Amino acid sequence: MSFVALIPARMASTRLPDKPLADIAGKPMVVRVAERAARSGATGVYIATDDARVAQAAAAHGHAALLTRADHPTGTDRLAEAVEQLGLADDTVVVNVQGDEPLIDPALVDAVAATLQASPDAAIATCACPLADAEALFNPNVVKVVCGAGGRALYFSRAPIPWARDALAGGTRVLAPGLPALHHIGLYAYRAGFLRRFPALPQGALEHYEALEQLRALEHGHAIVVHRTPQPPMAGVDTPADLERVRALYADGL
């Protein structure tokens, strides 16, 4: 299995300024992410950033970095530029490892790459796990995905889907037994050729209203295949509290 891991990293975080360079046990967070990605089967790991400080920090710790434009509207656009800089062949599998995931499981990176490689008719592979409880079902920050035959994604939503009419009658908030909904995990694999084309696809109404970029692919008829994992991954870093939690885990010898 051959694939490349790309790590988009931007400095402009409102809740945690300079997040990619936040120290975790003596190394910048983005370097910790690269270390985890390097433990997967990736043949190359590259940090794609719009800031020279991130590139310098990566190089200081022996990791490759690509300087990209600062005006990319999404991380996927940044990856598309990175694919061009690297000159990757269109059939190269590229895994997008988020730059704020210093606890990412290398085995999950391998799994999403293998899922795409086993699905030649799919444009994207991603991951999902069972919903934890009714609170997760109704939480708009927990993205739900429903799948059809062969694990193909039918829809992603912040809303509780599918709507269990009988179980939720009268305003009851429960997770109906056997509800065929999963908690989406934001780890993606693409083919380099699709990444090159993706930024040119116009945003549709579904992506606009849900604010979920992957819906653009579905709206334009591109298949997304979902790898199911039994457990949710360890949470990433969005806030100062998240950062302290991760620091404590590394201090304990993670």
From Swiss-Prot:
UniProt keyword list: Cytoplasm, Lipopolysaccharide biosynthesis, Nucleotidyltransferase, Transferase
Subcellular locations according to the entry: Cytoplasm
Enzyme Commission numbers on file: 2.7.7.38
Alphabetized GO MF terms: 3-deoxy-manno-octulosonate cytidylyltransferase activity
Cellular component annotations (GO), alphabetically ordered: cytosol
Major location category of this protein: cytoplasm
Catalytic activity: 3-deoxy-alpha-D-manno-oct-2-ulosonate + CTP = CMP-3-deoxy-beta-D-manno-octulosonate + diphosphate
BP GO annotations: CMP-keto-3-deoxy-D-manno-octulosonic acid biosynthetic process; lipopolysaccharide biosynthetic process
Enzyme type, top EC level: transferase
Annotated InterPro entries: Cytidylyl_trans, KdsB, Nucleotide-diphossugar_trans
Alphabetized CDD domains for the sequence: CMP-KDO-Synthetase
Pathway: Nucleotide-sugar biosynthesis; CMP-3-deoxy-D-manno-octulosonate biosynthesis; CMP-3-deoxy-D-manno-octulosonate from 3-deoxy-D-manno-octulosonate and CTP: step 1/1; Bacterial outer membrane biogenesis; lipopolysaccharide biosynthesis
Protein family: Belongs to the KdsB family.
Task performed by this protein: Activates KDO (a required 8-carbon sugar) for incorporation into bacterial lipopolysaccharide in Gram-negative bacteria.
Protein name: 3-deoxy-manno-octulosonate cytidylyltransferase
Organism: Bordetella petrii (strain ATCC BAA-461 / DSM 12804 / CCUG 43448)
Species lineage: Bacteria, Pseudomonadati, Pseudomonadota, Betaproteobacteria, Burkholderiales
Gene assigned in the entry: kdsB
